């Protein structure tokens, strides 16, 4: 983490319906928790998920964290393309990852523009849908 998440959480928090930092459960584990607690599903665009420099290279040579297998085994509600070389990164635990937030569609561009104004990297990585708690990775 290069910057404190205090300011970014205040900006996002004004409009978010759910927000968490990505830590030991990886982005998939935290997103699944939001889905379960909210009673919704989500379509996640794997190509929109930011990846740290060097992370994909490590994945390609088979480097995995000690929690990787456990995170994968607990994600039975996740449908992901196993032929995409990036999928293992979704289960990678972090000790201090970025923030993951659910923002109503009407507020998305307001929030993303405000984050850009202050120099915060941000991406729209998916969309929630009414339905059972599941993650569909595309």
Residue map of PLM features:
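Helix-biased detector of long, well-ordered alpha-helical tracts
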Residues: 1-138
């Amino acid at each position: 983490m290069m910057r404190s998440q205090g300011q970014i959480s205040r900006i996002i928090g004004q409009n978010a319906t759910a927000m968490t930092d990505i830590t030991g459960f990886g982005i998939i584990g935290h997103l699944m928790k939001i889905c379960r607690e909210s009673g919704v599903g989500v379509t996640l665009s794997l190509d929109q998920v930011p990846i740290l420099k060097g992370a994909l290279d490590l994945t390609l040579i088979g480097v995995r964290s000690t929690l990787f297998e456990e995170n994968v085994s607990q994600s039975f509600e996740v449908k992901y393309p196993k032929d995409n070389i990036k999928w293992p990164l979704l289960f990678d635990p972090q000790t201090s990852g970025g923030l993951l937030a659910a923002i109503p569609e009407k507020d998305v561009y307001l929030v993303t523009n405000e984050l850009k104004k202050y120099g915060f990297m941000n991406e729209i990585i998916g969309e929630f849908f009414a339905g059972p708690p599941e993650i569909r990775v595309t």
